[in-house]
Structures are given as structure tokens and as C-alpha cells.
């Protein structure tokens, strides 16, 4: 489908512009087609979060601006756009401005290799999973730069907490992704999804039982909890612990500079949820191989599964208390990393037996 659209556009534009213009324009069109809906989802995820948490606390949530509060994200965006960006006198101006940029860029760049269907991706590269692991690890630099450049004790302490926490849980997440790589035999995101559509259960129509979440259940749980820590979401949000260090590395930011951190956090939350769906929950594959389910387009299945995972993120925030910082470090280093290493060996040994279900 993407190739057909490209060929059609090339035929229409070929006689108007030089041959080198259309490929560049096509890349820009694909980038906008991915990022524009993403920004809309990020905006309305904030509304859904406030509504969902309001429901758990027997409140209505935002309901003043627009019908049922549907225009609240637009009002929030306008408010942040019109606020002044204040740079502290003692701050390092260059680093202070670079921090939010370095934080949001990896959160957006990782979407380049996320497939929305069998042939629908901004860039369908063979090392897609490796690209995501590499690009998302750069976000910690933005947090450190923001904390250092602010020249504030609270910001610096929050940045140190964030960097230690993100690096710690990246190791466990990396081992989880290595296990998925072993069973799928590919770093290509599309191949990883398609490999989950085969097996004994899938041959009987129960595709959801052949997805990676079932045979790799401990890895799935570790990945999900590590995703909470990696995105600094509750109960791992000691980075911006309101009762201790106000807002962590973001304490000196205002206006759109603060909004960029905000956008990065929610874009990352959607990203790790989509990755969870692609790696463990069958991506765009329907849960049951029957006409009742397969007529629904794959991108809708992907969206529905992602919505469920994101909602679980919000449920965790409204349910569990915040961990102490030492508890977070202990969980990452003494529990998750050993568990993932053990399962790495178990899955490797399992694949060498006659009972290998991933052949």
C-alpha cells in the first residue's frame, strides 16, 4: 500500500519537480503522518488520565471546557504556549535550552521504525529493535543536561535519580528484548509480530495463545514494570517526587520548555505501550482467527491493545503508593536483572529441546 502511494505520487509529481524532490517530500509526508496523530494522542492521553484517575477517586474529572471536557487539552496547550519561558540567572543558558530538546527528540525518533501493519512503517529496517534500544537510551542525556544546566540542587538531585533509575532498568529491558529476539529470530519489528501468528494454538484459531506473553510471561511482567520505571511513571516517579524535590529536573522550567518534558513523558508512555503490544501481544494480529475478528483492520487492533496497556499504566498510578528510591534500585538490580538472566538461559535451553514451540 505504501509503495503504491509512493509510485502514484511520483507519477503525478514527476513532470512538475525534479526527480530528487519527490523522495524528500515523501519522507516529510510520512513523518507528519506519524507525528501529527501522535501529538493528538499525547494531548488526549492527558485528558484520559485525569478522567480515569477521577473515576477511581469518585470524581468527574475535567468537565468545564467543551462538552465533557473534550477541549481541555487544547486549553492546556494554549496556556503553555502563552506562558513566559523563564531562564534562571545562574543557569547555563545553552544547556538549559538543550535539555528539553534532547529529551523529546529520542521519544519522537523511535517512532520511525514502529510498524502499524505488515507494510505500514516510516522505515522498515532490519535492525528496528536495535535502533529502538539505541535511540531510547539517549533520553537520559536530556534529563542530566536539564538538571545540570538549571544550576539548582533540586533539579540536580532529580536528574541524578532519573539517570540512575533509567540506566538500571534499561539493563533489564534490554535482556527482555534479547529473549524476544531469540524466539523470533529477527530484529525486524514486522518479523517479530508475524512470528507470533504461528504455532499450535494459532493453527486452531486461538491466535492470542501463540503470542509471546504466554510462554514468556515472566519476561512480559518484567518488561511492563521496567517500562513504568523507564518512563518515570508511578510508582517509580521519585524523580519528580512532589513531597521531596518538587518536580525534579523540571523544577526550573516553565511554558513550552516544561511542555516539551511533558510531551516526551507521554510520548514515551505510548511508545513503550506500543512496543509491549508488538513484542508480546501480537501487534496488529487479531486475537482469534475467525471472520468475526479478522475483518477489523490491523491498525485498529494495534490501537485497541495499546489503549488497554496505557490504561493499565493509569490504573497503576491511581492504585499503588510510590516506592522509596532504595527500593527501586533493589528491585532493578537484585530481582529483575537476575530473573531476566535466568530466563535468558531457560529459553535458550528450551529452544534446543524437541519441545521448542518457536520452530
From Swiss-Prot:
Source taxon at top rank: Bacteria
Family, per entry: Belongs to the complex I subunit 1 family.
Lineage, highest ranks first: Bacteria, Pseudomonadati, Pseudomonadota, Betaproteobacteria, Burkholderiales
Keyword Cytoplasm applies: no
Mode of membrane association: Multi-pass membrane protein
Top EC category: translocase
A Pfam family: NADHdh
Sample GO molecular function, one term: oxidoreductase activity, acting on NAD(P)H, quinone or similar compound as acceptor
HAMAP family cross-referenced by the UniProt entry: NDH1_NuoH (MF_01350)
Subunit note: NDH-1 is composed of 14 different subunits. Subunits NuoA, H, J, K, L, M, N constitute the membrane sector of the complex.
Record EC number: 7.1.1.-
Cell compartment(s), UniProt: Cell inner membrane
Role description: NDH-1 shuttles electrons from NADH, via FMN and iron-sulfur (Fe-S) centers, to quinones in the respiratory chain. The immediate electron acceptor for the enzyme in this species is believed to be ubiquinone. Couples the redox reaction to proton translocation (for every two electrons transferred, four hydrogen ions are translocated across the cytoplasmic membrane), and thus conserves the redox energy in a proton gradient. This subunit may bind ubiquinone.
PROSITE patterns recorded: COMPLEX1_ND1_1, COMPLEX1_ND1_2
Keyword terms of this UniProt record: Cell inner membrane, Cell membrane, Membrane, NAD, Quinone, Translocase, Transmembrane, Transmembrane helix, Ubiquinone
CC annotations in GO: plasma membrane
Species the sequence originates in: Polaromonas naphthalenivorans (strain CJ2)
Catalytic reaction(s) noted: a quinone + NADH + 5 H(+)(in) = a quinol + NAD(+) + 4 H(+)(out)
The name this protein goes by in its record: NADH-quinone oxidoreductase subunit H
Segments passing through the bilayer: 16-36, 94-114, 128-148, 167-187, 205-225, 261-281, 296-316, 331-351
InterPro entries with a match to the protein in the record: NADH_UbQ_OxRdtase_su1/FPO, NADH_UbQ_OxRdtase_su1_CS
